[in-house]
């Protein structure tokens, strides 16, 4: 099967963006500027990353591969941190969380023999793991901000009665973690029925037997 990007496919892709812009403008959602900037950034970033990955795959260097993974994790942590305006050391917390989840998962996959430590496998998988972690952490941060604002008085009363900061904040933290994990859990429940894993979809497009 020959898959190629042509002017017609690019035109129809652009039309999808136009539809989103029309809806945003008509319903006064305030997303018009964000959509335009996001699309422009996506195009520039994908083109740049395409050339960069082509070079990295050809060189097949251990240090360069690790640097690419570090860049992915750092960028994911930076974007997750922006979801909370109140959290101190948000970048560091996000970096450690995303770095640990990515490192542990990659380590298990390598030692189990599922993948090899080569750029063409490590970098895409690291990106998928870091992306999922970034979304979960971002949701958690946003929910933390909202709940602390709404329940500020209740938390202050608990502290006044002698509760520790951790104890007074525990229900809010638990609820925020649940909110952050909900999309991942829902995706896991419906995998294979509603959606296919990104890597599996890519292999199917490449003509590999789904089984």
Model regions and ranges:
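Alpha-helical membrane-inserting segments
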Residues: 19-23, 44, 48-56, 71-75, ...
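Loop-to-helix transition at the N-terminal end of transmembrane alpha-helices
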Residues: 30-61, 67-69
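Glycine-rich helix-loop "coupling/hinge" segments at transmembrane-helix boundaries
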Residues: 191-211
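Loop-to-helix entry region at the N-terminal start of transmembrane alpha-helices
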Residues: 5, 9-13, 64, 85-140
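C-terminal ends of transmembrane helices
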Residues: 21-33, 75-86
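Structural signature of hydrophobic alpha-helical transmembrane segments
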Residues: 3-16, 58-72
């Amino acid at each position: 099967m020959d898959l190629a990007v042509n002017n017609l496919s690019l035109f129809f892709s652009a039309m999808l963006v136009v539809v989103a812009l029309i809806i945003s403008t008509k319903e006064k959602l305030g997303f018009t500027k964000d959509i335009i900037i996001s699309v422009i950034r996506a195009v520039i970033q994908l083109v740049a990353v395409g050339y960069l990955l082509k070079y990295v795959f050809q060189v097949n260097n251990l240090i360069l591969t690790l640097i690419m993974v570090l860049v992915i994790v750092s960028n994911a942590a930076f974007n997750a941190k922006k979801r909370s305006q109140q959290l101190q050391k948000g970048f560091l917390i996000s970096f450690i969380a995303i770095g640990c989840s990515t490192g542990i998962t990659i380590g298990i996959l390598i030692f189990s023999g599922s993948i090899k430590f080569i750029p063409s496998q490590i970098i895409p998988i690291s990106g998928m793991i870091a992306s999922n972690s970034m979304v979960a952490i971002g949701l958690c941060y946003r929910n933390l901000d909202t709940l602390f604002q709404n329940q500020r008085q209740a938390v202050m009363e608990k502290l006044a009665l002698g509760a520790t900061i951790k104890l007074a904040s525990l229900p809010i933290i638990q609820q925020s973690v649940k909110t952050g994990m909900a999309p991942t859990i829902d995706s896991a429940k419906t995998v294979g029925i509603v959606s296919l894993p990104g890597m599996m979809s890519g292999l199917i497009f490449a003509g590999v037997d789904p089984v």
